[in-house]
Amino acid sequence: VLVVAHPGHELTLAGWLTTVGPSVFVMTDGSGQLGRSRLHSTTKGLLNAGARPGSIYGDFSDRQVYEAMLKHDVDLFLRATFELADWIVLDDVDYVVGDSAEGYNPMHDVCRIIIGGAVELATRLRGRPIGNYEYVVTGRRDHCIAGRCAGTIRLRLDDAALERKVADALAYPELAGEVDAAIRRDGIEASRYECLHPVDNRMSWTPAEGGKPHYEEHGESRVASGKYQRSVRYAEHIAPLYAAFWENISECLDAPAASRMVGASSLQMGGRQIRPS
């Protein structure tokens, strides 16, 4: 299973997608501030690669998830976690791959805890370990390119596969400009290597003392320019969201009976019931 925050992230793992043909969960529709989904471009690419959409596929707009963060609405993210855990168990998944938490975009970071929570729940339900891997979304990939990643799943694309990967990325209309800029900055060879790094289920990104995540600085500039009314902040929004999320997951794991029910109005596992706001 591959789990990404936004459509288009899968382009980074084009070789792995073609090799494995996983189910792909896309949390948001990629509509951004303009409100235009780019999900159809991802669907076309997945089908060409032999992959398939998962049960969560652009279910939320970017506006919805940011509003949930601002309102501390952990229920939205818990619902996604339970649904992903359900799929992992029913599809007998061996390992899950997803966005890394880098402090770049809050949804990337929240996607990481959704994956971690789902893997923990699915492991409890199934009774055997499930692998959890991340890949670099926006950060530096120097160690991957140099082959210095410890304990990773590492793919090196041949020339034909690399050419297809780059061509497909440039043909993704909504992201072609970003792809072209990345190629000019890093070179085509940077796309040859695809590395999946094992990660702890409860891993989360935290800023250095006195520092701010990229998304906080970006949000502040948007507020100052009048484009946003409020911006997502780590200490005010994301850290409390993490705490509430893991409190709920821990209660589920600590419950005496491992039962789960998913419905339109409630989620339950081990007797813990969460009602959507």
Name each model feature, range by range.
Residues 1, 78-277:
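Metal-dependent de-N-acetylase/amidase catalytic core
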Residues 1-91, 116-127:
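Active-site rim/loop-helix segments in enzyme catalytic domains that contact anionic ligands
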